[in-house]
Amino acid sequence: MELEIIKHNYILFRDLLRAVAIKTVAWPHGLGSQVEWIVGNMRDEDEHVFLKDGNKDMAYMTLSPVTGLLDGVQTSFSGVGCVCSANPGMGGGKLLLISINQYFDSENYKGLLFCKKSLINFYSKYNWKLIPPERVHFSTPHEGVFTMVYNCEDVERLEYDDRFF
C-alpha cells in the first residue's frame, strides 16, 4: 500500500474522476455536482490523497493547510476531510488513516478534523483525540460538529476561524 498525494493545482481531470468514484460511495451525488464541489471548494495548496494497492485506488481523503489558536499559540494544521473508502467495511479507511498518521509523524504535522458524533470512535482508534466541545471556539457557531486532533498534547482551548474543509 502506498499514498499518492496530488496538489490540487496540479490535479488532472482523470484524477478528479478517481476521487469522485470513491467519494460517490459515501456521498451519492452526481458526477457534475461532485466535480463542481471539488473545483469550487478546494484551493490550490490543498491536496488529494489516494491510498493505492498497486494500481487500485482503495481510499481517498483531502488535506488542507489551515491554522488555529491552540492554547494561545498560532498553530498550523493539516486539515483532514472527505475520508472515504472504495469498499466500506473492508479496511480501506483504516489503512488510509494509519498511512496518513505515519506521514504526519514523519513530517511532524499536526492533524485537525471535524466529524459527526458517530465517527468519533473510529478516529479515536487511530490516536486522534477529541477536544471537548466546550474547549473549541469557532468564529461562527457550528452545531453538531466535533473536533479531533492528531500529534497534539492535551488541548485546553482551540480557537478556530479558518475555513471548513
Task: Outline where the language-model segments fall.
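Terminal substrate-recognition subdomain of acyl/acetyltransferases
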Residues: 1, 6-8, 44-45, 114-165
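A conserved beta-strand-loop-helix scaffold within acyl/acetyltransferase catalytic domains
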Residues: 8-84
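Short Gly/charged-rich anion-binding patches and loops
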Residues: 18, 99, 118
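Short acidic (Asp/Glu) patches
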Residues: 64, 96-100, 130-134
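Conserved acetyl-CoA-binding loop-helix of GNAT-fold acetyltransferases
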Residues: 80, 90-102
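Residue-level recognition of the GNAT/N-acetyltransferase active site
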Residues: 84-86, 116
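Conserved GNAT acetyl-CoA-binding A-motif
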Residues: 102-116
